[in-house]
Amino acid sequence: MKTRCFCLAAFSGILTTLAIPNEIKETGYSILGFVAYVPLFIALNKLEDKKALMGLTVFYFIIANSLQNFWLGFFHAFGWITFIGVIIGYIPYSLTLGYFLYYSLKSFKNKTMSITMLFTFYDYSRSIGFLAYPWGLAAFTVNNFNNLIQIADIFGVFFVSFAVYFLNSGIADFLIHKNKTNLLNIAFPTLLITASFTYGMIKKIELKNLLAKEIDSLNIAAIQLNTDPWLPGNDKKGIRDSIEITEQALKENPKIEFVIWSEGVLTYPFSKEDQHFKSSDLHNELKNFIKEHKIPFAIGAPSNLDKAIGIQQNSIYMVEPNLNITNIYSKIFLVPFAEKIPFYEYKFVRNFFLKNFRILGQIEGNKIEILKLKKFKFAPLICYDDAFPELSRFYKTQGANILVNFSNDSWSKTNSAEWQHFVVAKFRSIENGIKTIRATNSGITATINEYGETIKKLETFKKGYLLSTVKLSPTFTTIYEKIGDSFIHILVMMFLITTLRFQFMEDKNQLLSSSVVKIKV
């Protein structure tokens, strides 16, 4: 029995990997999202031993996380540390999930809902805190069903995860028991999925006229470099190539009003070139290029560099044609075990990473910056920032009307990594009802509309430029913008109340039983 259950869990690990963007199909097989967790949930329902159930839960996530995040192993010289760190770092999370699953499945009658709620909590829990890594959420397994995921503008991405888990858990329960009562466990989640699809279709009809209006427009060039400037010897090449590609874009459209270069194009702070850069001539060429074309640039470069203690911030500079820097935004969310290195405050740890991997540690930014141009108010997000719904939502509440993501995922060397990141960006547009522009080093450079649909994009791992006349439509307030992840908080409260109520009833029954025994005696 145990061997069969572990095989089922491994099968789910493969199915969930195929459902999201992967190396076989870049967009993923989203149809699998509706059944990918079924083998796992059947196995969880079958196991009655506590250690076996907890072990199965950990085993599944090791399989799934390894298959879905293998590209972390390519993260520069210490990718293996990043990959192993992420896999091992989430074992305590899956152990905790397994622990709660055991007692919930043992105690509660509605196993379908118990599994659904606990797996949704798992998705949320690994999206917060020091080890936050919100990748591979259940919601992403159905990302190609655009009408379905529109419901994220009400309850957020975790509600979509809930719906996916609910359907999978219902199917698993029905396949185990196969009776009319358990048919309801499929009926309710199917109704929820159908209602979400219907909402998405109606939403697009209702917003069509509003989004057809135009308040302002802006000609934008997003430059895709396809060279990692942070690799040895690539720093100068990165600048030269970026200038060359930008010149090509300006030849095609001389009316460009805003140029966006990706994350980390410069390997030195833009405002301190003489102190940090070996070739001031090349940097002067860049400055003259900006002044000559009289166009504002957004450029990825480090800031607050301190080589003495080995730290810097990953930043975006908003540079005016006269070279004034109007904004410097620094990345707020850092990747655990890659940018956010445990114990980096100790000198021997800093020296180890600097000596062996030529890596400077990063410190988080602590404030948002809105880049203003005409009537556009851009919300800059650097790479991993866009994986956190609360940041994009906060930008929107502060008046931002378009998201712009600067990313360098070229180190991943895989299409699956680029497309997985792209899926994340789609949800931020849906949740907040605003467009997203992605300017990336190697993919996916694109413009995304308010529904999370791709307007234009470039191919991955190819040099190029994306020219877009971005239309600014009237903004509208989404329910998610107002309530955030309240759905999760309500779900947690419901689970706690149910658990406490069950515990109270158990204690009451035990008390009554002991009283009956005493009376008989």
From Swiss-Prot:
Pfam families in alphabetical order: CN_hydrolase (PF00795), LNT_N (PF20154)
Keyword Cytoplasm applies: no
Listed name of the protein: Apolipoprotein N-acyltransferase
Enzyme Commission number(s) of this protein: 2.3.1.269
Membrane topology recorded in Swiss-Prot or TrEMBL: Multi-pass membrane protein
PROSITE patterns, A to Z: CN_HYDROLASE (PS50263)
Keyword match ATP-binding: no
Pathway participation: Protein modification; lipoprotein biosynthesis (N-acyl transfer)
Organism: Borreliella burgdorferi (strain ATCC 35210 / DSM 4680 / CIP 102532 / B31) (Borrelia burgdorferi)
Active-site residues per Swiss-Prot or TrEMBL entry: 263, 331, 383
Domain CN hydrolase, chain residue ranges per copy: 218-472
Annotated function: Catalyzes the phospholipid dependent N-acylation of the N-terminal cysteine of apolipoprotein, the last step in lipoprotein maturation.
GO molecular function, one term: N-acyltransferase activity
Gene Ontology biological process terms from the UniProt entry: lipoprotein biosynthetic process
Compartmental location: Cell inner membrane
TM ranges: 24-44, 71-91, 128-148, 151-171, 182-202
